[in-house]
């Protein structure tokens, strides 16, 4: 795998749109490497021809068009640091953000997800906190590197967790920063994000190129 710091430094020298495309290309190369070399990842991969809802051909739990627009939003808002809740099976969003920003701090409940990614960590670019995002210890750890320019909540999608994560982490974002929730369109028993959006009075805007996913965000005032 390519050394991350020199790659990040090269990407940071590019204009935003080119930087995003290079970072996404590296993400896709990484995904191909993962699928070709790691049987444990292959077991998690779902062919989109079989199940489009639960799959992604780039091994990233995002809709590409939505991710591109979100990355453009972050860079356009001078985002240098971000807190992400949820590393995911493949850590693909975390990986992209680590190439584009000065520092990313991600909270992940599942130690197995952390263990899969731990060999790729560059501590000058990224921090991963392992634990329940709603626990006092984890929140206090996140505060150690606050304030952030943005927060992206994409962890446990139950109503209770999304509401608590929003309440706990929005205050760690600077004024003028971005507070974002993933799966903003996904209505269902396990997905409480749309309900949280409806119940809060923030000036929500939405990045949506799919019926099932979507990213909702507001600018902190």
Enumerate the predicted regions with their spans.
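A short alpha-helical cap/connector motif
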Residues: 1-152, 156-221
């Amino acid at each position: 795998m390519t050394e991350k710091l020199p790659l990040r430094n090269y990407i940071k020298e590019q204009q935003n749109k080119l930087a995003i495309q290079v970072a996404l290309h590296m993400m896709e190369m990484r995904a191909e490497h993962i699928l070709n070399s790691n049987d444990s990842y292959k077991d998690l991969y779902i062919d989109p021809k079989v199940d489009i809802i639960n799959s992604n051909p780039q091994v990233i739990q995002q809709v590409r068009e939505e991710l591109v627009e979100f990355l453009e939003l972050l860079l356009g808002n001078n985002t240098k640091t971000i807190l992400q809740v949820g590393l995911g099976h493949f850590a693909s969003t975390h990986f992209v953000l680590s190439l584009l920003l000065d520092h990313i701090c991600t909270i992940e409940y599942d130690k197995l997800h952390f263990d899969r990614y731990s060999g790729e960590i560059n501590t000058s670019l990224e921090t991963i906190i392992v634990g329940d995002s709603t626990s006092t210890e984890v929140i206090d750890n996140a505060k150690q590197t606050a304030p952030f320019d943005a927060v992206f909540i994409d962890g446990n999608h139950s109503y209770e967790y999304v509401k608590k994560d929003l309440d706990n982490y929005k205050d760690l974002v600077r004024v003028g920063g971005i507070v974002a929730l993933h799966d903003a369109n996904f209505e269902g028993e396990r997905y409480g994000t749309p309900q949280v959006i409806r119940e809060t009075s923030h000036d929500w805007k939405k990045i949506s190129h799919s019926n099932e996913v979507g990213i909702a965000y507001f600018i902190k005032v």
